[in-house]
Amino acid sequence: MLLSLLRTGRSRVATLVGAIALVVGSATGAVALGAGSAAAAPPSASPEVVPKPVSTTVGVGRFTLTTRSRIVVGSTAATPVAADLAAYLRPATGYQLPIVSGNSRARDIVLQLGKPAALQPDTTGEGYVLDASPSRVTVTATTPHGLFDGVQTIRQLLPVWIDSPTLEPGPWTIPSVHIVDYPRYAYRGVMLDIARHFQTPAAVMSLIDQASAYKVNTLHLHVSDDQGFRIVINGFPNLTAIGSIGSVGTDGRTMDPGGFWTQADYKAVVAHAAAHFMTVMPEVDTPGHNNAIIVSEYNDTTNPLLNGHPQDINCSVNNPPQWNFTGDVGYSALCPESDNTWTILSAIIKQLSAMSSSPNYDIGGDEVPNSLLSQDRYAALVNREGGIVNGLGKTVMGWADISGPGTQLAPGSIAQYWNPASGSDPGTETGTDAVAKGMKVVMSPANHTYLDQKYAFGPNVNVPPTLGLHWACNTGCDVDQFYNWDPGTYVAGVTDQNVMGVEGAMWGETVVNLSNVDYMVFPRLIALAEVGWTPQAERTSGYSDFLTRLAPQGARLTLAGTNFYPTPEVAWQLDVTAAAQIPVINGQVSGAVASLSAPGIAASNITASINWGDSTTSAGTVDGTAATSATVNGLYTVSGAHTYRHPGTFHVTITATAPGTPSVVTTTTLKWHR
């Protein structure tokens, strides 16, 4: 009665269903009792890392993480990053991985601060040099942020099963490699709209976890819009007591109840982001997109902070204002002449700025029709609000509409370009206007960065059917749209010198929970992360190279419990690993023998076979959570049953095959003693 103790390999087999198997990458070997193995393929000329590093040189041999491995820090400043790495590695490996200082030894991971000459071109402080050899792995960076980015690369150099939240057999190997890496742009963001549909702090923290793994460094949090105001503002209880009651669809389509965060919630999200080296930038859109503010405060005649006549804040289409829980835009505006407008906005800006880690504060500024506010009145509000933001030591950011006629914002203010060229609307004026005014530009052209757009749309095509819009992408925006563009040349007159970075925008009209958000965000945000990080010259290998490196991320996202769209543009991989423990009781095996990742492939289309190591083979049963129209399938289990006739040591081989994708093999050793 003993159990599976030795797993001796995982390999990808170049075969399709019905073809002759040819093993092109395999690894076998024995490990200590109770360990196991999942040997990865030999190192390729280009490790499957996204974003693609600036420079990669592959060496000979592999580093193996073992029970003796430690994480060695060169200074206390590296300790938090080391703790994060240890916490990440421990569940799948089962290793203690103590964090120590002093000299390193064989099998250690070293995190140290320094000034490598190779990082001289880096102006962000996020660069790192990673050296992996059979003896140790060393990450050197000028800042803890750079160490953190290097750790994200370590994660991807390890086999995908390192992302498992439960014990896996290993072995945990890294190819010998020398990597020099630093970002193209200092700003690489993701915007999440929690106003149109409320999202919990826990959901936002989960997005931070996954975005930071791909070196995204900014969370732009859209906390207010026509349909809801989501953060408590002291002195103005109605903003959340009234302003948070609904979301898009509350008037009968989905009956979404809305919600809000306390300031403690907001601070917790900021702290979680900081631990992942992301800053949080709040946005309260003004002077438009604020029906929730106006409805909340219009009748707030008892608030001592207001002058008793708060109705003068309303310059909207409707007077008195009315809730509108559709996705309509362009019907609300705050009056720039109202003292009450400035009392409310000043409180919001001061309180959110004080709680936020970003050096920037976003004033919004988009989609205000001249029928509500003339350009002069619009510019007056933008200019005055910009002065408040600057007075708090923050830099103004807003949608690129804020670069229009009459606005006079401080040099270095940031315009977020969003409106792509289309027909009679060239869309480029806001970008060139911003540059002419000495502003920096964050590039977010909707047809390349808007994560709320459908993946595919057209006659008889609607993916996903229940989520997403298509106004910016008439036929849909799949991963290729997010990858195949260059921020430094996209708008004539807006060059790399003007571009601060890129940002993906997850607007909230159709997403009601984290699963919806993840499905729309991933894998497209990964493509955008590479656009923002990797030098354009290093992306000349093309989209097919990116897709090859993207393919393993399907297993990693699945193991992390993150929903995503298994786009057919990617040849998603099968990845299999034997169970860490397979009980053999009185010679009988019955139950799970392996776990299998197969993004976008139904369990019914996968064939598994188990060679039990005693000259018998039987079919395995593949089972797990099936996909839906807005969820990827889950991790599958391969199960089998077998009875051994006599005690002994048995080398078991488990093979999984699906149409159109290479088969995969994992091996394990079972020992049965009476």
Predicted regions and their residues:
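Contiguous, structured surface segment used for ligand recognition
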Residues: 41-185, 516, 532-560
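Feature activates predominantly on carbohydrate-active enzymes
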Residues: 123-332, 340, 350-360
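Hydrophobic faces of well-ordered beta-strands that scaffold small-molecule active sites
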Residues: 188-192, 219-221, 280-284, 361-363, ...
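Conserved, mostly hydrophobic/aromatic
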Residues: 71, 143, 190, 211, ...
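Active-site neighborhood of glycoside hydrolase catalytic domains
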Residues: 322-413, 419-420, 425-438
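Flexible, acidic glycine-rich loops studded with aromatic residues
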Residues: 401, 408-413, 418-573, 673
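Extracellular/lumenal mature domains of secreted and surface-exposed proteins
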Residues: 572-674
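Secretory targeting and sorting signals
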Residues: 1-41
